[in-house]
Amino acid sequence: SPDLMRGQKSFEWMIDWLDNQFLELSKVLPDSWSTLYGGRATKLAALALRARILLFAASPLVNGNEWYLGFKNSDGEERFSQAYDANKWKKAADACKQLIDEAEKKGKGLYIVNNKENGKVDPFMSCYGATMRTEGEGNNEIIWFRPKGNYGDWEQHGTPRGCGGNGGDRK
């Protein structure tokens, strides 16, 4: 369709477009899905992706970074702005606050395990549980997850978490 043949736009145009798309999606996606449809996008997933792209756009990697000087589209326009914009951080912070507020309304929160001996937060077990426990096991920190079948279990068991595996945890 000619409408889709827009050519290369600037990074800022793309971020604004994605921001608007995720915001609109958050208005039409459901709060949750039944277990049968687990892993599908929800309102919180859309808001989380929105916050993440806005944080990236505000970061020094692309916000005023001179590394991208000379990256131009076919019309000769700069693809990345060379000017630092502090308002990008404000917009990202507002998106993160909106996500946190919506998540708390839905009963989401940090996964915390208290030490049985002194009642204080156990940072190791809290971190372990946040990354290794499912929602069914009491982890209400999960916003969006990747469902898996029982195929390829040995490969996944031996693959580090950073590469999509479970790093030796059988759960």
Predicted features, each with a name:
Residues 43-44, 55-171:
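An aromatic- and glycine-enriched ligand-binding surface/loop that stacks and positions planar moieties
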Residues 1-43, 54-83:
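Aromatic-anchored glycine-rich loop motif in surface-exposed flexible loops
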Residues 47-53:
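TPR/Sel1-like alpha-solenoid repeat signature
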